[in-house]
Structures are given as structure tokens and as C-alpha cells.
């Protein structure tokens, strides 16, 4: 199964969004909430690269860092990426557990929509573009646009070879309540 669009599709999305900012790209801003805790450099860089490499500029990355003193490299790496991308917001916080740390990331958000991502995730290059377009389509049809979700894949060594694919069904509130 193909998990990512063809290269030419991604290039077309990038061309459509070239030179545009989060304000003028026409897509709603999505704040990606991510609590950080002692994140290994490899995973942190892969995650940050996946945000910086999005095909659309409609994202804001909100990072709440509860790493301990032995992992000061987390802050250093994030600050390095902030130099490249003004849409990365960072705050050092006291560790209060994943739920409270995620809420701390939410306090940094200014987007119309919130998305959740773990510190060892990799965002598909078209994730924010696709979500933004889906929101616009729902609005155009006059349908509620308050909740979106996506499929996911789990990887071990290479993002080219998924270990597990989790294809989620169409929206079904009863199913959602049973699983969460």
C-alpha cells in the first residue's frame, strides 16, 4: 500500500503554496501539540524535520519540554530549528505527566485547530495541507468541521517499510467512544 502521495503530487502542493505564509495560504492554521520528555536527538530531529518539510505553511508546532537537566540538548535542538521556522513555539516546563504536559503545549497554541503528535512521530509531508483542505471542503458543504483524524503507520527502521498500518474507519461516534 502507498502511504505517501507520489513525488509529483507533493511538488504540486509545494508549488501551490510557494511564497505563501500561514496567514495568506488560504488554509486554517493547525497547531500541533507535542510534549517533549528526554527525546533522543535522532527522533527529535526527524520529527522537527517532518514539520519544517510540510507542503503547506498552515502549521504551528507547540512544544512543551519537560526534559530533565541531563537532557539539555532537547532545548538546544529546538532552538536551532526555531531559527529556521518561526512557527515553532517552545516552552520549558516542569514535568507533570503526559496529559498536563500536552495541556501546557495547548496553552501555546494560536491555531484554529489542534492536532496531537508524540515526540517520536514523523508527520507525513502533506499532513497539514491535507487536513487544511479537508476542513475547507467540509465548510464549503456546510458540514461541521470540528473534528478530523487520520490513518497512521508504525515503523521500525525505515519509513519506507511500515511495520503496522492502522487504517481508521469513517467517522462513527459510537465506535470512537468504544475505542477511547
What residue ranges belong to the model's regions?
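Short, acidic, metal-binding catalytic loop of nucleotide-sugar glycosyltransferases
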Residues: 49-58
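A conserved acidic beta->alpha catalytic loop
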Residues: 65-76
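Short aromatic/hydrophobic "clamp" motif used to bind/position activated sugar donors
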Residues: 114
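N-proximal low-complexity "stem/linker" segments adjacent to membrane-targeting elements
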Residues: 1-50
